[in-house]
């Protein structure tokens, strides 16, 4: 199977079954099977982008170490370690495999993906309960809008259609989506140049963006991150603030330098196999964190870093610093914005959601890898490279370097 064909099917299945109808399908392992399929497909295909393989090997060695470390520490049962392992490696496997394969798509393939996404969203809205918070529609519309602009953003009318798709996500009523929407509008319409760490204007722009995000999400931000931290006794806090405080204790005090290990804290595995750490830190009586009702145990991504400690935190930052440097090398400004939004959306959702580790975050990692590898270059049916279907930065429209890594098997 051609790489472009494989990824066309992957994208077609992704949004309907990993986001929109994931809870209704009655088949909760489709994202794991899709990830496994992508890994196997990567092994049998000729890949490019080999400069990233050292990073892949480093990550593999690191995860093997953490599996052994977790089994030796034995804070939770071995089953929790392996359940958590498959969830922790998923986003990075998706990113690395997509990066190595660097898929390109024909115009027809792009249209098929986008039409199915729009139809799926419309069908989802038929049974949507308006006025009730629903994170699913926000996540689906945001990713669909980004992909639409990624594929079709060469004309302003397509850019505005992409914005309209993202705007539909406001129906979710979720504060974190309001923050993502502010970020999206700011980067699409306000940002005129790449963010440079040595430029004062960058810090002003970032400051204004953060202020706007906090303003539009203040109610929840204040409840969780201002008033939520005012209790001195962790056991008297709400679930999310208590989880963040305890994560800090685990990382910087009690489990230096490698953390508490896989399957022990703030993850689905720690919920399925109720982690003893929740008794140790007095969290087992907090509403949403109890053994009987623990729906808020896997409530945010960043506290999960407690499982990896200071060392894991270092490698997490190292991974994203490398991605940020790669994003800054993208020559086409609109694609630069999309890649940056993928990264920032993962961070924003990570404060109050575990999409980073779930199937719902797979699209961000795929799209980021495609942006970094120049997958926005369109291929015709006879494999002739067409001009990029994006708005070019007037000063940085050279694409000679971004075409490296095209689908050599298509």
Labelled PLM ranges:
Residues 2-25, 33-82, 119-121, 167, ...:
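N-terminal hydrophobic segments of proteins, predominantly signal-anchor/transmembrane helices
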Residues 28, 214-246, 250-253, 264-273:
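Flexible juxtamembrane loops connecting transmembrane helices in multi-pass membrane enzymes
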Residues 36, 338-392:
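Transmembrane alpha-helices of multi-pass inner-membrane enzymes
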Residues 40-51, 98-107, 147-155, 186-196, ...:
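Structural signal for the C-terminal ends of transmembrane alpha-helices
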Residues 48, 54-56, 304-347, 384, ...:
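Hydrophobic transmembrane alpha-helices and their immediate junctions
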Residues 91-192:
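Alpha-helical transmembrane segments of multi-pass inner-membrane proteins
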Residues 167-172, 189-232, 249:
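A membrane-periplasm/extracellular boundary helix in multi-pass inner-membrane enzymes
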Residues 234-238, 242, 260-308:
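Long extracytoplasmic/lumenal interhelical loops at the membrane interface
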């Amino acid at each position: 199977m051609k790489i472009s064909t494989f990824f066309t099917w992957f994208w077609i299945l992704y949004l309907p079954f990993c986001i929109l109808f994931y809870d209704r399908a009655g088949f909760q392992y489709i994202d794991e099977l899709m990830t496994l399929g992508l890994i196997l497909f990567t092994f049998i295909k000729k890949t490019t982008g080999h400069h990233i393989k050292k990073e892949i090997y480093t990550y593999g060695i690191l995860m093997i170490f953490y599996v052994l470390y977790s089994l030796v520490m034995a804070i939770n049962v071995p089953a929790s370690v392996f359940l958590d392992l498959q969830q922790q490696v998923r986003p990075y496997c998706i990113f690395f495999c997509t990066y190595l394969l660097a898929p390109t798509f024909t115009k027809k393939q792009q249209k098929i993906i986008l039409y199915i996404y729009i139809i799926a969203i419309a069908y989802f809205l038929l049974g949507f309960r308006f006025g009730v918070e629903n994170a699913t529609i926000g996540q689906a519309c945001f990713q669909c809008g980004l992909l639409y602009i990624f594929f079709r953003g060469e004309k302003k009318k397509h850019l505005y259609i992409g914005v309209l798709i993202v705007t539909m996500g406001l129906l979710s009523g979720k504060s974190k989506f309001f923050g993502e929407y502010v970020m999206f509008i700011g980067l699409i319409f306000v940002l005129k140049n790449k963010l440079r760490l040595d430029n004062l204007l960058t810090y002003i722009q970032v400051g204004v963006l953060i202020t706007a995000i906090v303003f539009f999400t203040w109610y929840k931000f204040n409840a969780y991150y201002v008033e939520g931290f005012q209790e001195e006794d962790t056991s008297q806090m709400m679930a999310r603030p208590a989880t963040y405080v305890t994560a800090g204790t685990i990382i910087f005090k009690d489990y230096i330098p490698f953390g508490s290990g896989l399957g022990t804290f703030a993850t689905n595995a720690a919920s399925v196999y109720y982690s003893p750490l929740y008794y140790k830190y007095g969290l087992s009586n907090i509403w949403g964190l109890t053994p009987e009702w623990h729906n808020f145990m896997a409530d945010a991504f960043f506290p999960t870093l407690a499982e990896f400690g200071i060392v894991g935190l270092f490698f997490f930052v190292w991974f994203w610093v490398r991605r940020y440097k790669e994003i800054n090398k993208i020559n086409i400004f609109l694609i630069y914005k999309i890649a940056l939004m993928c990264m920032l959306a993962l961070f924003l959702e990570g404060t109050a959601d575990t999409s980073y580790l779930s199937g719902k975050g797979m699209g961000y990692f795929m799209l980021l890898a495609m942006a970094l590898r120049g997958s926005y270059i369109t291929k015709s049916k006879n494999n002739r490279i067409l001009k990029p279907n994006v708005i070019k930065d007037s000063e940085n429209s050279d694409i000679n370097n971004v075409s490296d890594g095209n689908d050599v098997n298509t």
